[in-house]
A protein has these predicted regions:
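Conserved catalytic core of nucleotide-sugar-dependent glycosyltransferases
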Residues: 99-179
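C-terminal catalytic/acceptor-binding lobe
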Residues: 3-6, 21-24, 179-277
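Short, acidic, metal-binding catalytic loop of nucleotide-sugar glycosyltransferases
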Residues: 25-37, 45, 59
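Active-site-proximal specificity loops/subdomain of glycosyltransferases
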Residues: 42-89
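Short beta-strand-to-loop acidic/aromatic patch adjacent to the donor-nucleotide binding site
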Residues: 89-99
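N-proximal low-complexity "stem/linker" segments adjacent to membrane-targeting elements
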Residues: 1-31
């Protein structure tokens, strides 16, 4: 029997000619090895009418899949209306121009188990911030690792590949349409990242191989967002505008801990080459240790990995070694 993840909704939107092909995206979610409780497609109430929807799409509606109508919020329509309508749910956002691998939901939910309370994405970039400014968006490195990556600050989830947002992961301003339309009208990924940062929600990225089965739907790329508004430095400019509106984000980008990502949980990796890893890891060893302690009631295996990382930096730490001994006893039971 197929596992259903209660309290988890897949949410997306579509527009224009893509309405005729979005059924392919929906079918790919309905065929998942593990299913969400609901799939919600949001449509612009001014552009579309229920009675005019393609039969291939409307025939899919039922217990699992629903179509809702709302105000046009551009790309934000895939998540913001769901946050407003179902505030206690967790969400997986996807795009309307892909057919997704059959285990997308399963992989994201496994990531959510491994990284409790984190935003989990199939693909991500490292936001490059140096010398008090953002580097051009094309320089933000795409993570292409064979293992998961985890970071408190520097990873940008890429919405097109699937992103899991646990309930309560985003700041209360997330649904403020006037704010996001004024500073980042074409960069929902950046806005949601900033809202996660303001709420101090970390990000985990799955191995790149997990999303390699994505397939672009024919004819959907003619007006893709990345080919229009976000070409070149469009994202960089909008990121600057977000930070200008929320200057409380600056301490995150300027933090010594900002450029650290955890990959194999055996070592910290620094995203710039200018300073040694040891200096950065040493500066946040207490944060690593406390994160392990907070997680121990929910995922003792992840706590053990994090505490081993802290031990590499501080091998004589009495609390670290005591906790590792405690974890080993519990795991062997």
């Amino acid at each position: 029997m197929t596992k259903i993840h209660k309290g988890v909704y897949v949410t997306l939107t579509t527009y224009g000619a893509r309405l005729k092909s979005v059924h392919s995206t929906i079918r790919s979610v309905l065929r998942q090895s593990e299913l969400p409780e609901k799939i919600i497609l949001w449509l612009d109430k001014e552009e579309f009418k229920k009675e005019e929807l393609p039969a291939e799409l409307s025939s899919l509606t039922g217990e699992r899949f629903e179509i809702h109508f709302c105000e046009n919020m551009r790309s934000y329509t895939k998540l913001v209306p769901s946050l407003l309508a179902f505030p206690d749910k967790s969400f997986i956002t996807i795009d309307d121009d892909f057919e997704y691998p059959g285990d997308l939901v399963e992989k994201l939910m496994k990531g959510a188990e491994d990284f409790p309370d984190a935003i989990v994405c199939s693909r991500g970039r490292i936001i490059k911030y140096q010398d008090c400014d953002f580097e051009p968006y094309p320089n933000w490195t795409l993570l292409d690792r064979k293992t998961e990556a985890f970071a408190n600050y520097c990873i940008l989830p890429l919405g097109y590949a699937g992103v899991f947002y646990p309930a309560g992961a985003l700041h209360s301003d997330t649904c403020d349409i006037n704010s996001f339309m004024s500073v980042a009208p074409h960069a929902d990924d950046l806005w949601f990242k900033a809202m996660g940062l303001l709420h101090k929600t970390p990000v985990a990225v799955l191995p790149l191989a997990d999303s390699m089965g994505m397939a672009t739907i024919d004819g959907t790329q003619d007006n893709a967002l990345y080919l229009t508004h976000n070409a070149g430095d469009g994202n960089t400019e909008q990121m600057r505008a977000i930070v200008q509106k929320y200057p409380q984000l600056l301490p995150f980008f300027r933090s010594k801990a900002y450029p650290l990502i955890t990959t194999d949980f055996g070592a910290q990796e620094e995203i710039n080459d200018r300073e040694k890893i040891g200096e950065f890891a040493a500066s946040i060893v207490n944060e690593i240790r406390e994160s392990a302690i907070k997680l121990e009631s929910r995922n003792i295996f992840l706590s053990q990995k994090l505490m081993k990382l802290a031990q590499k930096v501080r091998p004589q730490g009495s609390l670290i070694n005591a906790k590792l001994a405690e974890y080993e006893k519990k795991i062997k039971r």
